[in-house]
């Protein structure tokens, strides 16, 4: 609010000047023309001439008083001085005397403090000396100026990528061996002995230009890495010509993991469509895949691990790119596969009618969509069956597990008694990759397992609706036979045994007894949902009778598409079981269906006993993949970038798009002046470079790896081939590109384009804490309670998502005492990568010194939290000094801890000035338990109770957790004079509704209220202090005494300065509890200024400076003149968004613009307006005067910005009904407050009923990890929607190479692989239908055929030519 402390100035929420009948109305910024305030009359004020006269009169009176006092002083008779000399101290001698005296006291106190042999009787005296010492320090500190924050640029390690590549000469291994190791990702998961065994089979191959590496018809049984030269990977086009889909440069590889899997499983097939040729003379390294079989024969435990990595690559790389980003669904799966004919068979009974009276049959309809819970319900005999091993622990549980659980588990230093204490094998790593708990006995033995005895203490799971379960009974005669599904009694047992034999045959299980007590027979009614997409607890399903329909949710559409139909004899769910990833489709029984089920934990027990079982399961996955997926497996790369290496540099050619699988990347732009600026950071699941690749523009920024990062690489030629093969991909690309361009256009709708406002053009990219996966915690000193701090933070993070805490003790307990040795670095890196995949965020607690574990924590971190004690002297810890001397690329944040009963933050600037650039400095008010000194056992017992309760969302630790996970909630308060008092009422209602606030900002009166709330964090205390200030604003004498000659302004501003200073004293913005900013208008540079540090009262006053009434405030940093921020941005929600807020609650209290103005034609006479005004019988006209026109011109940019904010998706726009209050109605504080409070209660009550608040607090990554949320780093203001379709649908003509492997007439052969696997499609008659079926079965078959055709499950016609696309 731009006014002085008198009652004649107006608020900063408006600034119109309307001279009317000798009066002038001065609205605040954001206020419009006449009639904005609910029909309120103009506010009279003292004209300039009258003001000068009053000022002159006051000056005359003051002069007369001074003259009178001087005259009276001169008339006082002087007393004669006594005889003799008079001695007196000079002032300077007096100052020196007392100064020396104080310093003597200080030195004596200091020397006495150093003496350690102080007796107990001298302690009171020492306390007095300490108090004197503190008083002396305060006296000496008065002369010092308040320190200001030193402007620091990010260090070179943050903005610059390494210029040198990896030095292979420093390794004792041959260069070609390291070359193969670094460029084939699947080999990176081998341990060193296995990898060296493989490299014995590696050979060199030299190719001339035009020579083929392989072509259709030749075996696909090798991995190729280009050492020098250039290879081209080709696929046949629709006209029989080869189309180059990928250029393989030195360092890249040509391989298909599905082909490797086929060779390992013994189902090798020759190439059908893919060929590779040398574009110029080249040298390649060739590794035959047969070498894998020899290695696995020697190291059988590694077989499961490697197959698992191949499956993970298939799901994460191939499916992520093709389904999540390109929108392909049933094109990824083959619909032609030959199932087994299980029933009817000799010796088995025919189908009979179900027993309707059986208690196991639960009648449900298909419309109800009942779901089968994957578990074991009670046994029909009455004895409870235990659930499968590895039931996940609740996120808030802190019970000591019997084995380390990887899914939503809680670990702490005191909770290591139940952890395995030895090194893990490859199979144990596979267990953890599949998110299965490894028991201590099994992990120690590592040998073959018999069927383990079930733990009788485990509780049975709930009986699923719509499905019943049969568990084989040893004593069948005792039960008298159990009716099941279409069979009864002993018939079910016979079917069960026959089905297990068929399953053992399919999976090549040598010992069928491994299936005993691990296989369950299920029967599902029609319409039952067996498993849903996204489920974590998955199982294997072996269809016996009926069929299971597999559906997948379509991207950007609220519908599911049928991928395929699992017929009798087929396995479903093996991909999710092997990878440990969530299920990527939904299983539904369209009709009654019978199947065998093996839980994930039971399947891993079988694999431990016979590792080769994983080959059969993996082969069933590979056989279901379509030929198109096998082609894309060659084309889509799985690449890695080491920490500090550049993924690409600014100005490079854009030839591909990247998807981050894990790790972190940073984007930096170099301006024309050579200055480098941080654009943003990318985390897991982000899409990079899509706009540049589609528009074929050079790279706009340099992107380098913050830490070791894995990516999926989609080449440009591959994207063109996909568009030719599946034209519907163009729609998805238009959607992706339109999101990026739309985000740019919304930024350009502001008053100034791009970053001219001082705001980065992309909001989410500017948040350094967005999309974090790992956080390292580093102490400043040994006094920091690190264990308690990390546990408190973990407790707060658990409310957002699964969180894992790791320290050196936990690592040694889980992976063995030698886990941190350099020889175990590979295994530790792989295990940590698994933890990042299984958890929302991983906390790394460093040691107190620079140990190998501390170095590992810093290497793995996306962000580093430097934790200090706020009540201690600002110091730089020893570990921090080592950190400053190393090139750490992760962003740093300084976290200061404060006691709950202690004073507020102070001297934050000194903490920050001692360190290099920090991206943030949160203050945390900690509970008393954090600083209590307890033994590890007592601490463990205490936090067991803490973790049993849900974290308080209003605590500072919860606020830090929301910041780290990108779920910040910001509160933005607009300007509007006395109407801004309603902000406090809305704040009170916001507190009562339970909505936390993590960031506060505002303009004008909003900056004042926001600063109070950021300091107090209490609406009640904010109301009390704001009411006192509002009362002072009703004074009349102070404004009169503050009048001056109106050259720059009518008032000097000193009275208003005193009123603001009395509220905030010398508080710094850095010392506020909540992060805070306000907005001012820089009239020196004609730009908006956003203030996040510095003197609080000065920048609040600057944001409330109304033109003409208060002089501009000189910025103490650079001397620029600052005015009211409402002139340019009266509701800065966009600033809060650019600072990383996920949701912005914006409260607007500005007056509404008058838009109903009179039409007067092409010219206007002032005499006519005067007549209309003086004539009481004339119709009133609404025409703005000169002052109002100037005011509207001043607020054009503010109005535009407000409209953009109101229409944005991230902003919750609120406007209380306060239009009936005037700008200077500070005397009506309570009435305005009540209006805001009642309005807030109504709004937030609706939010609570509509579940809006819970959605605000829900982590966005947990809702939809597949959504591309990033605005791309490249912005093209000239790009519009008219040429959008042309950009994304442009298909380059294929390279005119005639393929020797296929003629024009053999196109169908080229586009179909594995013809020997082809069989009847999914619409054929089910082989599993028993003889003697009811006549309605045929009609059901026909009905199912039509359904499958409608859902695109049947084979489609081959796509058209490139012109059709």
UniProtKB/Swiss-Prot annotation:
Annotated Acidic residues bias: 1303-1319
Highest taxon of source: Eukaryota
Motif annotated as GXGXXG, chain positions: 975-980
EC number(s) per entry: 3.1.1.5
A Pfam family recorded for this sequence: Patatin
Keyword Secreted in record: no
GO terms for biological process, alphabetical: lipid catabolic process; phosphatidylcholine metabolic process
Motif GXSXG in this chain: 1002-1006
EC class: hydrolase
Motif mapping: DGA/G: 1124-1126
Annotated family: Belongs to the NTE family.
Function: Phospholipase B that deacylates intracellular phosphatidylcholine (PtdCho), generating glycerophosphocholine (GroPtdCho). This deacylation occurs at both sn-2 and sn-1 positions of PtdCho. Catalyzes the hydrolysis of several naturally occurring membrane-associated lipids. Hydrolyzes lysophospholipids and monoacylglycerols, preferring the 1-acyl to the 2-acyl isomer. Does not catalyze hydrolysis of di- or triacylglycerols or fatty acid amides.
Record's protein name: Patatin-like phospholipase domain-containing protein 6
Organism: Pongo abelii (Sumatran orangutan)
Lineage, opening ranks: Eukaryota, Metazoa, Chordata, Craniata, Vertebrata
Gene: PNPLA6
